[in-house]
Amino acid sequence: MWTQHLSPDEACSLQMAAEAKSDMPLVTVLSSSHGPIVKRFRLVDGAVEIKPAAQIHRGHAQTVAVDGPGSLLRLIDSLAPNQALSLGRLEQVGARRPLASQHLRRNGEIARTKEFFVWNNGPACMLLDVDTKSLPETVLNRVAGRDLADVIVDTVPEIETAPMLVKASSSAGIRLPDGKARAASGLHCYVFVADGRQIPEMLCLIHDRLWAAGLGFFTVSRSGGLLERSLVDTTVGSSERLIFAADPIVHPPLTRDPPRPRIFSEGLPLAYVAPPDFELVERMKADAREAIKPAAKVQKKHHETEQIDRVADKFRVPRAEARRIVKQRLEMQILNDDDLLETGRGRFERVADFLGRVTGQTALPCPNEGSDYGMSTAYYYPASDRCPVPRIVSFAHGNITEFHFARFRRLRGLTWIDR
């Protein structure tokens, strides 16, 4: 089993420091009991293949203190491949708590939910998760040749005086056998703040300040939905969010040489982010939304037609019936027995066959977005003591979407009760 690379003395020191100084920033280390959860990189037929990070179904969690960016960096560097961070805290600092998925949770176990993970009522770390992969040309032109952390600080100068750790994402620094480096597209900026409870609001304010500076945009999802974006990801402003900060597993002949992290230790924790001109921001968002609507409409129609054709061809049913089945999934999040689920890249399975085959919790692509968005962006949860019906929960695009099975519709909303 993977273990965190901390000596007993170091672990004890972290716990004692947290208990002795409740005004120190707190983070939580989550450990999986079922193996590595980090990304894996390997070379397949001359191309880099990425296996996405996995979720934690069972393991344990422990809240510890970090006394500044340097301390946080040492903690991150000590993480094993089966570990991740949450910037929220548990009620009891230093205690190692057994962890399980919500539907598997037994007495004495906690789940990675807001019921157990909360923002510290005091100093905490706020993550600015920066990714350039989906930036449109209009935004790329504004940031071309500049460090994105500097762009954010210039746009929101309040951040400049706060302690901060800037670290490249786990995908950065992957090198091919010929020595060429794979382009790094992401940054993790950990900003120390005075009150963790303000983090969700601060992230939204930073997001809107970026919009006001012309650094916001909309993208179109594979299913044709509009996704509001900026240089920072606001979905990480949730106390139970998993942050895959540990180094990835890199299989030879690939190697990894990531950029060196930057530490800014001076200054006081961030206590305030000034609001933007909200009327200006709303006008900019409305204009951007209108500009991209035609493309979204085309993509939505294309996606729907593609899904209908696949169901009609696979099961030899009339297109009208295939359209009904697909619209149930796309518009009502209901999965008919004769619908198709993508359970592997390019591999589709009849819903009824999937229900007959799968007995435990299983990762799969989002039923609407497919494997292009990721291989484990949704999870199938079987019926359990807490819920009498199975379901699929998608986390695509930072949203939680529940898909229910048509055969169990009459049982929806029921829960088991003790007698």
Regions inferred by a protein language model and the residue ranges of each:
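A short glycine-rich, hydrophobically flanked beta-strand micro-motif that places a catalytic Asp/Glu
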Residues: 164-166, 224-227
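Conserved short beta-strand edge segments in small beta-sheet-based binding/regulatory domains
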Residues: 214-222
